[in-house]
């Protein structure tokens, strides 16, 4: 006779960093998020990027059209900051409830970021307006100078961009997204109530050895790149401490298999199907399940000034095998932990 499975009931979570893409990809991936999460901050790095209220309204409608019947899901839209963005357009979108936040991509830091910001000074009027109206700034925190080693780009960003920016605009709310280093974990922990961070499941579960030793694993390749184990451990300790300004942001970033498994593969992990169970596994390993619900469902809304979700979901602790692939028009998607046996999954 088998022992009954352990069940974990939590308030419905939100995903504070998500890529849904567009077209057939969007239609394929949306249900994996909408069946679990109440809301998600949707990244604006389409081609062309989402830089106007009209573009965000249209994109939001395409997302909602892809949500299956019976799923209660609200996409929260973001504006892609560019050197030429009009502060009035940004404020209009925020006041009309279209834009929840704005995203700063340093030019060429990640997928579809060629339109990104060349320098903070170039967008200072926009940032000053955001500070004035209370609009959160979401930051991909890496410098992009060719001479800076890829493993050092986050730490260098803190000292050269993030700290000077926050010193200059002291009332600006900032989310340091997908942090990957001890430097960033310490920086956020020591920051004030206007600084928060998201962390992905892959950066909590893995380090660069997992990606590079015994063969290259392209489906663990994302940006910011996985770091050495001391950084992974610092991230795990941050979430396990119950610190309330760090929250769930999967950075789920789907690419077709042929774009990941190539001579010059794309960065991004499609983790939407397995992320929540992955986070639960980490919290269990850290003996910190008492902080799991806050990380997933409470800390994010509190920072954004939004209500928590009023429905609940359950995770069950029983071994399940993750699908090897997911059909995508004329290709496939490879989910995070494909083919592996996982300990926690959302109860259907």
Curated annotation (Swiss-Prot):
SUPFAM superfamilies in UniProt: Metallo-dependent hydrolases
InterPro entries membership: Amidohydro-rel (IPR006680), DHOdimr (IPR004721), Dihydroorotase_CS (IPR002195), Metal_Hydrolase (IPR032466)
Catalytic activity: (S)-dihydroorotate + H2O = N-carbamoyl-L-aspartate + H(+)
Chain sites annotated for binding substrate: 19-21, 45, 140, 223, 255, 267
UniProt GO MF annotations: dihydroorotase activity; zinc ion binding
Annotated positions binding Zn(2+) 1: 17, 19, 103, 251
Record Gene3D superfamilies: Metal-dependent hydrolases
Known role: Catalyzes the reversible cyclization of carbamoyl aspartate to dihydroorotate.
NCBIfam families for the chain: pyrC_dimer
Subunit (UniProt): Homodimer.
Record protein name field: Dihydroorotase
